């Protein structure tokens, strides 16, 4: 099979709106979590979120942006960055059937779904809904709103698999490359951040509510006093490219994607089984002949999910566990965008030789004892890194990325 490498990165997140800002935040262990007046005013119990600190007004042509939700906007801006980072000219990717795009979101756009329904019930009816709500609200809005303005002629579709969405998009892109169907695939996703989305998670008791007065402390993966995840938004895109194609054009190669796992728990709609995660990591590691130096865990700061994943890691690695950190303690949980964002965080650590910390661990959960959980920024040369992304419905994705070797 052909080999797939990553040659470009683009990101808009709660800890930075480009690669340089994100890198600085990762090194400093800087939290992107803030107080949300919007969530408080909506009547929610959780008043904290990982918001994007960026005014996107005027950043995208109005004829393009009129079709977009925030999820699509974040993914579009990320794709612009990734293309520039990869050194791709328009001639290299536009109108080219060998260049495709796979990008999604976990929740579509609840904001525009609600807007459309509310407008329809109002006095103006359909006129108030307008012609652009469909592309903003539809589940495939992210891929549609990127493929059209970027003139993509290859594959073009969304994957939606809850919090594993954009990791699955990357994995599927790798498979397109391996099978020889595409030379380049832009892969990733975006997620909007709004009360209309957040309230659904608050209603099921999944969000943090104890730290509204200290937002930067609310996301605390592996801490004994964690009480739920902090919802976040943003986007990310990577350029997945066939190795020989990348070498031929002299591209900078961040890493080769040497492993991809995708499994289902088939056990519970919300609670992870752990067994599916074990199979997923083992699948991703199959044929990988170098040890995993660093694992970016799914680690969302939920009481059950965190320790289920750690138990799975123990089963997979035994007494040879890699260094582990959960970047969601800094960023919050961006749902469908989390997979690609955390792949990018892992790639930046691989590129720059360090491990970002799991912050806010004041009292380590006893079920995390004995594992190499990194709580301070650590300089270390890395060769092979793993990123886990798991979601409701028992969906699992694992990516293994390695510095290129012959």
UniProtKB/Swiss-Prot annotation:
It comes from Escherichia coli (strain K12). Pathway: Lipid metabolism; fatty acid biosynthesis. PANTHER family: 3-OXOACYL-[ACYL-CARRIER-PROTEIN] SYNTHASE 1, POLYKETIDE SYNTHASE-RELATED. The active site is at residues 163, 298, 333. Keywords: Acyltransferase, Cytoplasm, Fatty acid biosynthesis, Fatty acid metabolism, Lipid biosynthesis, Lipid metabolism, Transferase. Its main location: cytoplasm. This is 3-oxoacyl-[acyl-carrier-protein] synthase 1. The keyword Lipid metabolism applies. It is an enzyme of class 2 (transferase). The gene is fabB. One of its GO terms (biological process) is monounsaturated fatty acid biosynthetic process. Residues 1-403 form the Ketosynthase family 3 (KS3) domain. InterPro entries: Beta-ketoacyl_synthase, Ketoacyl_synth_AS, Ketoacyl_synth_C, Ketoacyl_synth_N, PKS_Beta-ketoAc_synthase_dom, Thiolase-like. GO terms for molecular function: 3-oxoacyl-[acyl-carrier-protein] synthase activity. Its EC number is 2.3.1.41. It catalyses: a fatty acyl-[ACP] + malonyl-[ACP] + H(+) = a 3-oxoacyl-[ACP] + holo-[ACP] + CO2; (3Z)-decenoyl-[ACP] + malonyl-[ACP] + H(+) = 3-oxo-(5Z)-dodecenoyl-[ACP] + holo-[ACP] + CO2; hexanoyl-[ACP] + malonyl-[ACP] + H(+) = 3-oxooctanoyl-[ACP] + holo-[ACP] + CO2; octanoyl-[ACP] + malonyl-[ACP] + H(+) = 3-oxodecanoyl-[ACP] + holo-[ACP] + CO2. It holds the Pfam family Ketoacyl-synt_C. It comes from the Bacteria. GO terms for cellular component: cytosol. Belongs to the thiolase-like superfamily. Beta-ketoacyl-ACP synthases family. NCBIfam families: PRK07967.1. Induction: Mainly activated by FadR, but minor repression is also conferred by FabR.
């Amino acid at each position: 099979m052909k080999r797939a490498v990553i040659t470009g990165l683009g990101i808009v997140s709660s800890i930075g709106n480009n690669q340089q800002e994100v890198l600085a935040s990762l090194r400093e262990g800087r939290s992107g979590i803030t107080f949300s007046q919007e969530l408080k005013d909506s009547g929610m119990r959780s008043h904290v979120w990982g918001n994007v600190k960026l005014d996107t007004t005027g950043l995208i042509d109005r004829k393009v942006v009129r079709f977009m939700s925030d999820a699509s906007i974040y993914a579009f801006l990320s794709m612009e960055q990734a293309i520039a980072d990869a050194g791709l000219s328009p001639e290299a990717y536009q109108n080219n059937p060998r260049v495709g795009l796979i990008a999604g979101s976990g929740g579509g756009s609840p904001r525009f779904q609600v807007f459309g329904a509310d407008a329809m019930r109002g006095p103006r009816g359909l006129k108030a809904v307008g012609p652009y709500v469909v592309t903003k609200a539809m589940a495939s809005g992210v891929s549609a709103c990127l493929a059209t303005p970027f003139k993509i002629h290859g594959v073009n579709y969304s994957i939606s698999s809850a919090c594993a969405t954009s990791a699955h998009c990357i994995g599927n892109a790798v498979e397109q490359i391996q099978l020889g169907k595409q030379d380049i695939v832009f892969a990733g996703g975006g997620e909007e951040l709004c009360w209309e989305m957040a309230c659904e998670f608050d209603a099921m008791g999944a969000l943090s509510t104890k730290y509204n007065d200290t937002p930067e402390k609310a996301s605390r993966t592996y801490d004994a006093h964690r009480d739920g995840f902090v919802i976040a938004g943003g986007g990310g895109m990577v350029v997945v490219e066939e190795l020989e194609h990348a070498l031929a054009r002299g591209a900078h190669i961040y890493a080769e994607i040497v492993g991809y796992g995708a499994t289902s728990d088939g056990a519970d709609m919300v609670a992870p089984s752990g067994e599916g995660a074990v199979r997923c990591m083992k699948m991703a590691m199959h044929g990988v002949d170098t040890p995993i130096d660093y694992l970016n865990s799914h680690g969302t700061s939920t009481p059950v999910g965190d320790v289920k994943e750690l138990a799975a890691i123990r089963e997979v690695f035994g007494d040879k566990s890699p260094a582990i950190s959960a970047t969601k303690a800094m960023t919050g949980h961006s749902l469908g965008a989390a997979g690609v964002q955390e792949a990018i965080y892992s790639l930046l650590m691989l590129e720059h030789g360090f491990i970002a910390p799991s912050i806010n661990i004041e009292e380590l959960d006893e079920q995390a004892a004995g594992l190499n959980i990194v709580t301070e920024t650590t300089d270390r040369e890395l060769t092979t890194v793993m990123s886990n992304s798991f979601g409701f419905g028992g969906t699992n994705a694992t990516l293994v990325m390695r510095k290129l070797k012959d």
